[in-house]
Amino acid sequence: MSWQTYVDEHLMCDVGDGQGHHLAAAAIFGHDGSVWAQSANFPQFKGQEFANIMKDFDEPGHLAPTGLFLAGAKYMVIQGEPGAVIRGKKGAGGITIKKTGQSCVFGIYEEPVTPGQCNMVVERLGDYLIEQDL
């Protein structure tokens, strides 16, 4: 299965609410910031944004004072799982990032998708990739 298939079929899928809602954007990146696959509308990282996200996995709490930035948009960092999951909120939407052995799985949501639905979609794929040593 190609990495793009994981994004298209496992991240940009129906979130399971029975109403056909899905994430606004999703991507899988290598730990070095290389794009493995992404939805067409996934925002592009600027400057040190990706490096700062990776630093927060290594030093949990690093992003809390400044926020998480993606393409210049600021997300307030909310409770995640230190070293494993970063969650952010921006207005009625937000972001979930799950770190695996070799990659980071990103999901961005907007209403009516809920934070919990985004977490479930992103973390389910992330857990699968961890089981596959990816």
Curated annotation (Swiss-Prot):
GO molecular function, one term: actin binding
PROSITE patterns: PROFILIN
InterPro entries tied to this protein: PFN (IPR048278), PFN_euk (IPR005455), PFN_sf (IPR036140), Profilin_CS (IPR027310)
Predominant location: cytoplasm
Subcellular location field: Cytoplasm, Cytoskeleton
Keyword Cytoplasm: yes
Signal peptide span: none
Pfam short name (any one): Profilin
Disulfide bonds: none
CC per GO annotation: cytoplasm; cytoskeleton
Spans traversing the lipid bilayer: none
Keywords of this entry: Actin-binding, Cytoplasm, Cytoskeleton
CDD domains registered for this protein in UniProt: PROF
Oligomer status and interactors: Occurs in many kinds of cells as a complex with monomeric actin in a 1:1 ratio.
Function: Binds to actin and affects the structure of the cytoskeleton. At high concentrations, profilin prevents the polymerization of actin, whereas it enhances it at low concentrations. By binding to PIP2, it inhibits the formation of IP3 and DG.
Family: Belongs to the profilin family.
Protein name per its UniProtKB record: Profilin
